[in-house]
Amino acid sequence: MSVVFRESTERGLLSSVDVGLLAVRDRACLRLLYRAGVATADQLATLIFPSRRTALRRLRRLWQLGLLERAPLAPERGGIPVAYRITRRGSKRLGYVDTRTGGVSRVRHTLDIVDAVCALVRSAPGSVQLWLTEPMTDGILPADIRPDSIVVLQRDGGSAVVCLEIDEATEHSPMIRARLGAYERALAGREGWHLVW
């Protein structure tokens, strides 16, 4: 099934929207979608909104305003999930450079990354202190290492920095071994840094 994002046909004039007047959570949602690329309502309910119902209501409003576009995903079990991403016009209106990428495999990969972060958030609420998406990780580790995400965790017993690599079975084993070796060298001597593949 292909992923086709569509803007709302019922949206009002985007130029009349003052994004500074949006609710704080709505602006946080737009920032997260810009940085992560794409997310579902369930994921956004875990990361930003207080409930799934609120997430669906707020996402629909942002979609109607022309700030978001959405696409149905292949159902995994009952119901058809919907993925959201910021529109080209929405990016421009918010002062962002449009960096969206398409393709079914890229959308699935991005949703899996967001799922991993959501699992960390759900497993220990309040422990995720920082989440850097792939574009934000540039320059943190050596040039040959660019994790899908870096997550900083803080618990009573200590803290950790987790480099997330989501494998979609698109790389051959020699490439994976080379990347694991590069991570081993890059993380050597960095106490508290871990790789989750």
List PLM regions with ranges:
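A short, highly charged nucleic-acid-interacting micro-segment common to nuclease
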Residues: V97-I113
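Short, well-ordered alpha-helices that flank and scaffold nucleotide-derived cofactor binding pockets
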Residues: T46, C118, R122, R185
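Active-site metal-binding core of divalent-cation-utilizing nuclease and nuclease-like domains
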Residues: A71, R106, C118-V162, E168-A178
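A broadly conserved amphipathic alpha-helix scaffold signal in soluble, globular proteins
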Residues: R60, V114-V121
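Catalytic cores of nucleic-acid endonucleases
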Residues: E168-W197
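Nuclease-adjacent, charged terminal/linker segments that flank catalytic cores
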Residues: M1-T101
